[in-house]
Amino acid sequence: MEDDDDDQRLLHSLGVTSADIHDIERRIISQATTDPADSSGPTINGGHQPDDALAKLHHKLRSVQIEIDAVASTIKGAKLKQPSGNKPHEHKGKDQPDHHGAGHLQQALAADRLTSLRKAKAQIQKEILQSHPSPSASNRKDKMLAMLVQDEPRHKKPPVGPKNIVKRPMKTVTYDDDNNFDAVLDGASAGFMETEREELIRKGLLTPFHKLKGFEKRVELPEPSHRQDDSAGQTEEAMEASRIARVAQSLKQIAQNRPATKLLDSESLPKLDAPAAPFQRLGKPLKRPVSPSSDEQEKKRPRNKTKRPLPGKKWRKANSIKESSLDDNDVGEAAVSVSDDDEDQVTEGSDELTDVTLEGGLRIPGTLYTQLFDYQKVGVQWLWELHCQRAGGIIGDEMGLGKTVQVLSFLGSLHNSGLYKPSIVVCPVTLLQQWRREASRWYPKFKVEILHDSANSSSKKSKRSSDSDSEASWDSDQEEAVTCSKPAKKWDDLISRVVSSGSGLLLTTYEQLRILGEKLLDIEWGYAVLDEGHRIRNPNAEITLVCKQLQTVHRIIMTGAPIQNKLSELWSLFDFVFPGKLGVLPVFEAEFSVPITVGGYANATPLQVSTAYRCAVVLRDLVMPYLLRRMKADVNAQLPKKTEHVLFCSLTTEQRATYRAFLASSEVEQIFDGNRNSLYGIDVLRKICNHPDLLEREHAAQNPDYGNPERSGKMKVVEQVLKVWKEQGHRVLLFTQTQQMLDIMENFLTACEYQYRRMDGLTPAKQRMALIDEFNNTDEIFIFILTTKVGGLGTNLTGANRIIIYDPDWNPSTDMQARERAWRIGQTRDVTVYRLITRGTIEEKVYHRQIYKHFLTNKVLKDPQQRRFFKARDMKDLFTLQDDDNNGSTETSNIFSQLSEDVNIGVPSDKQQDQLYAASATPTTSGTEPSSSRHGQGKEDHCPDQADEECNILKSLFDAQGIHSAINHDAIMNANDDQKLRLEAEATQVAQRAAEALRQSRMLRSHESFSVPTWTGRAGAAGAPSSVRRKFGSTLNTQLVNSSQPSETSNGRGQSLQVGALNGKALSSAELLARIRGTREGAASDALEHQLNLGSASNHTSSSSGNGRASSSSTRSMIVQPEVLIRQLCTFIQQHGGSASSTSITEHFKNRILSKDMLLFKNLLKEIATLQRGANGATWVLKPDYQ
């Protein structure tokens, strides 16, 4: 409480009032969902609270009924397919991750969920009956009396006219007639209803395989200790025999139900061709010639970097002693002997600490088991259940809950049970020493080796090693090759030591895995663990394809943010831990991602919304058993309170002038015209918001006045906040996105004589743990400045209790990672987080999109990516400055004016209550008073019809998927019975067809080994249609595509259509948005109608694989799939020498394209060709990528 008062006094002294970030998100979402013209809210809330509560129960009941129907349809669909699926079940075996095992698991989960939903429905019905028993009874009596009294008038109704009878069904309840929007939002838009089982899984009390025969591995009870008499011996033998029989029966069930099949009849599946390009690796990149002058500049820069403070001698010495003790093999053997002594001590007290045994034979050391939290014990049990299925999984626990401890405990238990094989852990370079330290603490018997230059004690000053995982190359698909300082022979010796040891554990980085893939990818590992595994979220990135070639079926991903942006990223993660579980990427996008995305559009039809819901149900059942995610609030983690404030800072005079000058420049016009990359303009604006001197860094970095805090609004806020925090005894973490901003911050801290430490991509890996240890264990260091991509990943910085996030990131999970560095297990003080955002600028747009993406991520199966492809109006929205125009109205002021009327911004004028930010936005003497809003209770003002553009922008941020899908969902629930049955039936057919297409895609992918990357539409080999390789080849990372066995191709193309009709890349979001904008509801519904006819259409087109034109002309009523159409366009232009006139193209395709699809056709043509005008007229010329 004292800290809260101190914070409030600090903010008031700065002219700032704090805002609770969760309240901001809730208010923004609720404002975006509220109709501005609706003025009936206050009257409803006047005196009808019981009616509102009853309405909420009714809406909840309807949403539960909708989900019951959806889950029941999946069970019925599975049962209907069982008789026809007997023949395929005869082909069971090892290499096919599909069929009976997966179907049995999904059906069991669906049946359990259906039971829980029915219980919830009965409970809601009971609550409804209990809420108003007497009025309902009186209403029934009134209705009965009315029926008796109106006997005579009832005979007069038929002659009145049949028109009224016809019109009555038209008066169905619509959303506009439903004033209880909050009830609709709670009941329908909140996603799937959480059952009791799912709640227990979320709280860490159960595993996803609880009470599923053949999948659950329970803890076996310890055997009784008194066994002297013969009867006890007989019971012991009986128990041992029963245990063996039970294990044998369990293994038999696993062999039968495991999601794998063996194909005995290869003629029943499509054939695959060999890859179009031979398997080869890229050569060394060319080095640009460097002039002597530039070489001297490069030498000067590292000298400047060495000025940063190093860890204290005490901590450097302690860290070097720890590393040398772990590096030295002799000391390692001594450590093993010490652990043996510890084992002797444990055996002395074995009566108390015996091994805990799970079904199947996993023995968890007693000393280890007692140190784990309950949810961590459940995590170890879940990993063992996955091990018995020969499958992998994603540990998606929230940051700070001990994912590393759970993995090491499980690997140690495997070693203790004699089931361990040498394993590999891939992680960012910052976490290498932390992994080694945790491994030596939790299971000292592991012989840990680090495959990285930082572990080489002989090369003390190898600076290049620290650059390999810098934030500059973090998200790059084409990372620079880092020359290893160790000779290849030494790497070979290190790898051979790990592989030959029965307890070897290899730690390396993603970059080293990419460089040394030839050595590491040929080894059969026991386990492959990817820490911060969202690094492979891009399915076509080179590092992703390298990781998917690791030779093991036991794969684990550790990430605190398993779902960040879109469904294709979720596919990439799951395809690593369970190859082929979600099919190939083009089929997954067509059958799941596109329907779910289209169902979330504002103009989605009821059929599209229902289809999206059914597809989401199927996808959830596929994914959830292999994704374990627990939150801090659910597992009763003993953590202190965390509060988060958002401080909106004003631009200084210099910043505002620079910002406006850039917006008026020709460069912005080039961005609007599409002649320049928009990311360039976004980067310039964000630099201006941080500090305008960043634009002149190359020329003015040596100027003594470079980085003056008076020229940056956020720097002035930081200066005042740090001064107060220093006096109050707090310790601070400050995160920025770039090293350049850290340079300015470092100069500022040096001038203010603050004790600080710095860590970024240029910090040598050997110093990072020493820096972290020094900051956590001594109070001398006041502030630790870091970049979010290096210091915000997996590090433990509990020594701080104040965090400043200087600039927001487009990806909310990045800021979330940085925030969780201090608020985690081990923290003893309350944590306060400050986010600094420059008001009215692009940073405010980034922050609002963060809220939007976070809101959609919580719905798990929604795709927030649709706003990532910016159109013209989005660009104009980004490249604007809204600070003192339009009476000082900004997006933020609109939000906070609805939060509270009592907002103190340092200008106590009543006349300016409606212009909260006008005074602080205009230049004042100080120029940069930050402003924010306080969490309060004030009446909410609805935006009028003539609302500002900012209100409309806020609505457009949220009207895309989550909110309006709830509206359409409610319209479906209120539809009449006939229409509802038809919609549900059609949606069920689409969902079942999607599941069938996914099943066939898995069968196709199963031809290849688990170590062959899955086809993504651009890269990979497993499951790729042969026609794609024949026409386009592998357009990316051909060096990572393994050669498969050549096979016959007589029916390759037709069968590729049978697994989803996707040849080539899937429909992009930009094309999809253009299609929906051009054809409104018709185009989207036609696309889904085409999916309804996909199965029958593929049967017709398979017979004409050589000539797609004949089949398409005979089915004119059917819309051609965009992926097929773009391939036909490319083939036609190639046949005409790479160029064709508009007349010839139109003449050729006029009988295939419907009039309402002409806009899609034009966009597809622009995607692969450019229009060139010459003397002979205009011609379309293929782009180089398609020639």
UniProtKB/Swiss-Prot annotation:
Superkingdom: Eukaryota
CDD domains tied to this protein: CSB_WHD, DEXHc_ERCC6, SF2_C_SNF
Species whose genome carries this gene: Oryza sativa subsp. japonica
Biological processes, Gene Ontology terms: transcription-coupled nucleotide-excision repair
Listed GO CC annotations: nucleus
Keyword field contains Magnesium: no
A GO molecular-function annotation: helicase activity
Subunit-structure text: Homodimer. Binds DNA.
Binding locations of ATP: 397-404
Family of this protein: Belongs to the SNF2/RAD54 helicase family.
Induction data: Induced by gamma irradiation.
Name this protein carries in UniProt: DNA excision repair protein CSB
Spans annotated as Disordered: 31-53, 75-102, 217-242, 265-351, 457-480, 916-945, 1095-1116
EC number: 3.6.4.-
This protein's encoding gene: CSB
Stretches with biased composition (Basic residues): 300-319
Record's keyword terms, sorted: ATP-binding, DNA damage, DNA repair, DNA-binding, Helicase, Hydrolase, Nucleotide-binding, Nucleus, Transcription, Transcription regulation
Function: Essential factor involved in transcription-coupled nucleotide excision repair (TCR) which allows RNA polymerase II-blocking lesions to be rapidly removed from the transcribed strand of active genes. Upon DNA-binding, it locally modifies DNA conformation by wrapping the DNA around itself, thereby modifying the interface between stalled RNA polymerase II and DNA. It is required for transcription-coupled repair complex formation.
